[in-house]
């Protein structure tokens, strides 16, 4: 069996949590929390994709370096010399945005809902949502969502991700999710129109 992609290493006992286990466990919790809003599928998808970038070789090199684990297959990768973190949330944000924008493309429905969920993923390590607009009202979130694959490693993560994670994400990112999100935002949009 190949070594699992590592999400976390518990300092107290050295126990490794695989990316697959981390994403599935977070998805299960997020689904329960989102139940209060009748947005279980949205919560589950957010949990499943929030750390999708941890499937990248760059993140795996980073976590091995940070934890002192040794993996000779990663030895040719450079570590981050300045101690900076590796972006591991944008890949999931881009994936969700790309998949949801396919729905209701003519009306921009999927685009809008993909932005909403993508922003949640891209912002999950901050102290709130990332800036969505600059001082002039220009869409600043576009910079994050348009980051190159060289920086987000989305294509690599899609190749590396466990099949069970990818299948569940594809299953969740469908019309049922779009309908539930629309039902949730309709009252807000109706209030804006009046």
Positions of predicted regions on the chain:
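Accessory nucleic-acid engagement/destabilization modules that flank
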Residues: 2-194
């Amino acid at each position: 069996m190949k070594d699992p992609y590592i999400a976390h290493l518990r300092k107290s006992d050295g126990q490794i949590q695989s990316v697959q286990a981390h994403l599935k466990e977070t998805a299960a919790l997020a689904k329960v929390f989102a139940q209060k809003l009748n947005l279980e599928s949205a919560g589950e998808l957010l949990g499943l994709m929030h750390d999708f970038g941890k499937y990248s070789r760059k993140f795996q090199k980073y976590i091995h370096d940070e934890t002192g684990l040794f993996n000779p297959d990663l030895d040719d990768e450079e570590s981050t010399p300045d101690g900076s973190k590796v972006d591991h949330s944008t890949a999931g944000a881009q994936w969700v945005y790309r998949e949801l924008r396919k729905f209701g493309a003519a009306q921009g429905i999927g685009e809008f809902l993909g932005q909403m969920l993508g922003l949640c993923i891209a912002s999950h390590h901050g102290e709130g949502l990332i800036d969505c607009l600059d001082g002039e009202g220009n869409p600043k979130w576009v910079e994050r969502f348009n980051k190159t694959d060289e920086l987000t490693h989305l294509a690599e993560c899609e190749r590396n991700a466990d099949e069970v994670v990818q299948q569940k994400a594809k299953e969740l990112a469908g019309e049922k999710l779009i309908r539930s999100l629309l039902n949730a935002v309709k009252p807000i949009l109706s209030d804006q129109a009046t």
